[in-house]
């Protein structure tokens, strides 16, 4: 209600401009008042910024978005005032308020939780270089809430390509990896994990990579990844346990084969030679896991 007069005046000015540009009785278009009307719109331009700021402070985020949006639309539709043009020419600067206007309009739309406003506004804001990390994070959150995995992936990939792989963009990279895993694209997931490791070699990444190699039955690579994880953090009980499980699973597979042996003597010999060594290999890993975390190991 506070800015109803400002909005109403803008509507009337637009209507007046439209009427002034209609052809006369002779079919000729000869605007009489357009210059004055546009000047009046220019005079009101900054008021929309002020209205946006006050609406934002009052937590009326939708109204703040609308006001900033009008602030951005006016120069697109009606150009900028002669006075403003002169100021910019003299200073030799670009008017950065439009960059900030797009940014704040996008944030206001995001906070309002109106996805239909927020997603296009955020996509417009990322065309500038101002605080793009926040813009990508907001977009990612909205796409995640909508369970839109195609756009989640696209926005994460764009963020990583634009800002490089670093601690700020790590979560985008992990999101891409998780989407690959969910879609059973294990090799792509491993390739992206390698990029994450190159940027920040965390033991957790090696652990995930080891599990992915297990998925594709590459136990040697899985063990190498788990060993690397433990080099970086020897207190990861679940990784010690995971390594024990690889040998335990091998023992189980061997026992399935050995159970087919009919001769008792042959069976006992095979068990001694093929299964027990694997259990003996698994045991120290489980013991280590238990010593670190007796509850969960």
Describe these PLM feature segments.
Residues 80-84, 101, 135, 169-172, ...:
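TPR alpha-solenoid repeat register
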Residues 78, 98, 132, 166-169, ...:
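Residue-level recognition of tetratricopeptide repeat
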Residues 51, 105, 139-142, 159, ...:
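Structural register within alpha-helical repeat arrays
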Residues 19, 74, 128, 162-165, ...:
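Structural marker of alpha-solenoid helical repeat scaffolds
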Residues 16, 71, 91, 125, ...:
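Canonical positions in the second alpha-helix
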Residues 1-62, 66, 70-99, 249-285:
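Short coil/linker segments at helix-helix boundaries
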């Amino acid at each position: 209600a506070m800015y109803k007069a400002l909005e109403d005046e803008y509507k009337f000015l637009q209507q007046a401009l439209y009427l002034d540009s209609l052809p006369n009785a002779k079919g000729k278009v000869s605007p009489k008042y357009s210059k004055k009307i546009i000047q009046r719109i220019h005079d009101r331009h900054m008021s929309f910024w002020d209205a946006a700021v006050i609406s934002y402070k009052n937590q009326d985020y939708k109204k703040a978005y609308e006001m900033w949006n009008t602030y951005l639309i006016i120069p697109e539709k009606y150009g900028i005032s002669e006075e403003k043009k002169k100021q910019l020419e003299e200073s030799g600067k670009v008017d950065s308020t439009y960059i900030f206007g797009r940014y704040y309009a996008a944030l206001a739309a995001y906070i309002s939780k109106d996805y239909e406003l927020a997603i296009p506004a955020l996509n417009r804001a990322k065309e500038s270089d101002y605080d793009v990390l926040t813009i990508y994070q907001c977009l990612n959150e909205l796409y995640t809430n909508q369970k839109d995995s195609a756009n989640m992936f696209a926005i994460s990939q764009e963020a990583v390509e634009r800002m490089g792989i670093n601690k700020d963009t790590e979560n985008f990279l992990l999101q891409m990896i998780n989407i690959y895993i969910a879609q059973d694209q294990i090799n792509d997931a491993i390739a992206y994990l390698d990029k994450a490791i190159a940027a920040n070699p965390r033991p957790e990444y090696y652990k995930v990579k080891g599990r992915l190699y297990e998925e594709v039955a590459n136990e040697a690579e899985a063990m190498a990844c788990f060993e690397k994880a433990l080099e970086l953090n020897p207190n990861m009980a679940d990784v010690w346990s995971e390594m024990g499980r690889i040998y335990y699973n091998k023992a189980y597979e061997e026992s399935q084969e050995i159970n087919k042996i009919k001769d008792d003597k042959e069976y006992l010999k095979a068990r001694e030679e093929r299964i027990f060594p694997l259990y003996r290999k698994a045991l120290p890993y489980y013991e280590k896991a238990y010593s670190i975390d007796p509850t969960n190991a």
